[in-house]
């Protein structure tokens, strides 16, 4: 039996459109929803199993991507947003009405500073870049998934076309390590 991973990947990956130029993310509130405008195509979209990311009801993974912080603007009902954990690297701003995480900028000194994490399934528009891998797969155990299901879940992710990792994908991990090495002087800046 197939696992319910996330509603936007359970039946295959969404299709990217070359004409997608950004759009509007909308929370789940039926009255006064929070709206966030994102300019341009998103990057590094992936399914994520961490316990920090917002997930739709019944999903064991989130779908999360990044955009440049300068390309992300709260346009309506921003007064409903509250930072979930001020000590976290990703400052996840959640709607106090429905709980959806609407945007999460990285503001501290980090390789991802200047990027904002978003959940692209909240776009009104279609055509955003689909997930390309799965991160922090083992972390779904921390949220209650039976470890005996993990081999099947990893196999299902691969069938969908999402390589499962227990960190980020190799390219992003190399980027973080390179940034850290330059910061420490181990590599030339």
From Swiss-Prot:
GO terms for molecular function: S-(hydroxymethyl)glutathione synthase activity; zinc ion binding. The keyword Iron does not apply. InterPro entries: CENP-V/GFA, Formald_GSH, Mss4-like_sf. Disulfide bonds: none annotated. Its EC number is 4.4.1.22. Keywords: Lyase, Metal-binding, Zinc. Residues 20-166 form the CENP-V/GFA domain. Pathway: One-carbon metabolism; formaldehyde degradation; formate from formaldehyde (glutathione route): step 1/3. One of its GO terms (biological process) is formaldehyde catabolic process. Zn(2+) 1 binds at residues 27, 29, 95, 98. Zn(2+) 2 binds at residues 48, 50, 53. It is an enzyme of class 4 (lyase). PANTHER family: CENP-V_GFA DOMAIN-CONTAINING PROTEIN-RELATED, GFA DOMAIN-CONTAINING PROTEIN. Catalyzes the condensation of formaldehyde and glutathione to S-hydroxymethylglutathione. This is Glutathione-dependent formaldehyde-activating enzyme. It comes from Mesorhizobium japonicum (strain LMG 29417 / CECT 9101 / MAFF 303099) (Mesorhizobium loti (strain MAFF 303099)). The gene is gfa.
């Amino acid at each position: 039996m197939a696992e319910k991973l996330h509603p936007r990947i359970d039946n295959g990956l969404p299709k990217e459109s070359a004409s997608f130029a950004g759009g509007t993310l909308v929370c789940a509130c039926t009255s006064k929803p929070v709206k966030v405008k994102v300019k341009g195509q998103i990057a590094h979209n992936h399914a994520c199993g961490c316990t920090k990311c917002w997930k739709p009801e019944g999903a064991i993974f989130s779908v999360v991507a990044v955009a440049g912080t300068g390309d992300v603007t709260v346009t309506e009902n921003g007064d409903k947003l509250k930072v979930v954990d001020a000590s976290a690297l990703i400052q996840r701003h959640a709607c106090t009405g429905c709980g959806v995480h609407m945007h999460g900028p990285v503001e501290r000194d980090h390789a991802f500073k200047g990027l904002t994490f978003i959940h692209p399934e909240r776009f009104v528009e279609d055509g955003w870049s689909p997930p390309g891998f799965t991160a922090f797969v083992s972390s779904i155990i921390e949220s209650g998934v039976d470890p005996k299901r993990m081999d099947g879940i990893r196999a299902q992710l691969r069938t969908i076309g999402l390589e499962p990792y227990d960190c980020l994908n190799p390219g992003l991990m190399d980027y973080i390590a390179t940034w850290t090495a330059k910061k420490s002087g181990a590599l030339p800046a």
